[in-house]
Amino acid sequence: MKQVSLVGDVGGTNARLALCDLETGSISHSLTYSGLDYPSLEAVVRVYLDQQSLRIEQACIGIACPIDGDQVSMTNHSWAFSIKQMQENLGLKKLTIINDFTAVSMAIPVLGADDKVQLGGGLARSGKPIAVYGAGTGLGVAHLVQSCDRWLSLPGEGGHVDMASCTEQEDALIQQLRLELGHVSAERLLSGPGLVNIYKGLVTSDHRVPEILTPKQISDRALSGECHDCHRALSLFCVLMGRFAGNLALNLGTFGGVYIAGGLVPRFLEFFKASGFREAFADKGRFKEHLEAIPVYVITHSQPGLLGAGAYLRQSLGITL
């Protein structure tokens, strides 16, 4: 009989739950729930398990917040809980809660050739460190290294580092955002809300009044060519994504590749390919050639967080990925 476990990917907007086949790692019965519709993560899990009519003994859930100890409090959501208490309440033998980008990073070793698109650089070097980051409701970051036959994810909160500027345009943008926000982290620019901040900052720094637009409206207007300011904002977003990725690559010498996840970039992949992303990625002065050799991939798998949560759980049970 097939043995399955519960896996989850919980962000600031949605909670995705699915079943993972422990033998093959395949993901099935995926459902998405709005975080606004439920008082707690436990409530969402109960609804999902009732819908599947299954009793599950093990679960691994990636959540968009730092994981340090038993108490979990989400960064971009009001949910907070005790891991131990939730495990007891759900009657689980094993409940593992990990950072959402720990989960995404653990998907990388099990991605298929059709699950990613390469954007420049050479061949990924086996055994070398890997970086992964992604823009969605927030900005997630992790690194991945291989030790013998095990993969080790290095979680962190890299999305909250200071955002530096490299041009006069970026100087003006960050200065404008600093007046509004105080501390300007990378996440304040490289996320869905960040795209809105870029748009507002560019227009305001030109002494004009910006429209009230959503991230999707900005990207749609940019792609259709109907709004010059939206096009400017999306173009600069791509450049800043490149600068940030180049910093990640330098931090750990990620000759295993830099991977882009998250819900934003796949929506405008062709625009992203043609943007200034790759030039900005390698724009590191004396280390330009160093960066030009490093491959960058956009993850196109629809659910890397679920896939990676399953991989993390399977490896913790002694299964080689």
From Swiss-Prot:
One of its GO terms (biological process) is glycolytic process. Its EC number is 2.7.1.2. Belongs to the bacterial glucokinase family. Keywords: ATP-binding, Cytoplasm, Glycolysis, Kinase, Nucleotide-binding, Transferase. It comes from Psychromonas ingrahamii (strain DSM 17664 / CCUG 51855 / 37). One of its GO terms (molecular function) is glucokinase activity. The lineage of its organism: Bacteria, Pseudomonadati, Pseudomonadota, Gammaproteobacteria, Alteromonadales. This is Glucokinase. It comes from the Bacteria. Gene3D superfamilies: 3.30.420.40, 3.40.367.20. Its main location: cytoplasm. ATP binds at residues 8-13. It is an enzyme of class 2 (transferase). The gene is glk. PANTHER family: GLUCOKINASE (PTHR47690:SF1).
